[in-house]
Amino acid sequence: LFDERGFEATAVVNFVTKFRLTVPREVMEERWKSVPNIDRLYRQQSVIREGVNSPYVMRAIGAMESIFLQMERALSDDRPFLMGDQFTLAEANFGPFLKILEMVRFMDFWLDAYPNVRAWWDRVASRESMKQLDSFPYNAIADDSAHAWTGRETAPAFERKLKEYREAFAHAYTTQD
């Protein structure tokens, strides 16, 4: 389910929101001088410079939509967790990435189309180990946190991109088999 596409997509969400709006461009330019991975460098530069108009944003949306679709299908048999009745490494691995969507306030509009994934997230998020993420510095519980305000600022444009993606690829990304 969750492979390198999910890691990259989560990074794009973080860069198009928090990093783009809170880190001065000069700091990013300096940081990029030491990024050894050309794909990561180009992705970061594009997302910082172009915002939601970066082609990497659409790719990130596609990756997450594919993951959410697979999750929705897996959870459609009323199992509580991805592999069945038990919390597994699948939840431990993917939960923190969905936490980013929650932190930037994208969770509600993104998961409207995936009620089983939303219910799964609610179960995962209610676990004590996941709640502990809220106690770390730079958490996004507060509405004035960097993740929260940058997410709210970016959300309308990002939501339009998500809608655009869903309209363009509705034939490929439906919850029906």
Walk through the language-model features, giving the residues of each.
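GST-like fold's C-terminal all-alpha helical module
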Residues: 1-126
